[in-house]
């Protein structure tokens, strides 16, 4: 089974067959999974913010989501994350396969190992095989996808200041968002292959003369939804024979 976790603007899967909802209890809370078959591949789907976009980034129950997917039998997870662009190489509407992260969050529950000493290797947090598969899909579908980018996870829910963005750029950050961590680290703790597609919705704070507009961001997400579904759907097709 393929786990799918989507961010802002993606609240359903077009073409999902045999769709049904299942409540999965975990030690961290219950999670409502949407189960079904997409392009021949069994999938379990979670929209991070809820179907009505009511859960802010710092209140998402990341541990429950990842444990629910693991308990449901997911063998890998593909995720999307809406980002501001720090590196000018990444234009608005760009899809980026994230390969490293920088954690700037605070106050989140970030590990399954609260009561034991465990140091999980984060040298390659995003699965290389999944990233290569996504690039193969992009090539076959004629989609423009950038392979590699450093994602800075800010806490939210506010947007970042220009001073913070300058600091993140100095750290080497290419993208900034609010939801990519601790999801990726939890996947590593579960030994679950995980890949994330960053979608650049806007230049980060202070990098554009135009004021940051939520309406503009939603417009970009609407435009990129079709190629993003093609990318995810193509991956599901290629992974169908695994499960």
Range-by-range predicted roles:
Residues 66, 165, 181-184:
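Generic hydrophobic/aromatic pocket-lining and core-packing "Φ" positions
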Residues 1-122:
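Metabolite-binding pocket within alpha/beta catalytic cores that recognizes anionic/polar moieties
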Residues 70-73, 169, 188:
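Non-catalytic positions within long, well-ordered alpha-helices that form the structural scaffold/packing
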């Amino acid at each position: 089974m393929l786990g799918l976790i989507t961010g802002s603007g993606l609240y359903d899967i077009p073409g999902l067959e045999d769709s049904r909802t299942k409540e999965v209890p975990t030690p961290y809370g219950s999670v409502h999974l949407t189960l079904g078959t997409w392009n021949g591949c069994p999938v379990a789907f979670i929209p991070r913010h809820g179907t009505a976009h009511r859960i802010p980034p710092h209140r998402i129950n990341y541990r429950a989501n990842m444990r629910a997917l693991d308990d449901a039998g997911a063998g890998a997870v593909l995720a999307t994350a809406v980002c501001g662009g720090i590196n000018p190489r990444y234009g608005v509407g760009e899809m980026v396969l994230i390969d490293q992260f920088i954690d700037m969050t605070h106050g989140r529950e970030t590990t399954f190992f609260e009561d034991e000493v465990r140091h999980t290797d984060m040298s390659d947090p995003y699965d290389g095989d999944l990233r290569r598969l996504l690039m193969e899909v992009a090539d076959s579908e004629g989609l423009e996808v950038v392979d590699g980018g450093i994602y800075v996870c800010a806490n939210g829910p506010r947007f970042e200041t220009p001073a913070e963005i300058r600091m993140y750029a100095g750290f080497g950050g290419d993208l900034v968002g609010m939801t990519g961590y601790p999801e990726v680290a939890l996947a590593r703790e579960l030994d679950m292959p995980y890949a994330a597609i960053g979608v650049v919705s806007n230049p980060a704070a202070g990098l554009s003369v135009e004021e940051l507009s939520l309406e503009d961001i939603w417009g970009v997400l609407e435009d990129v939804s079709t190629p993003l579904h093609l990318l995810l759907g193509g991956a599901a097709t290629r992974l169908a024979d695994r499960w």
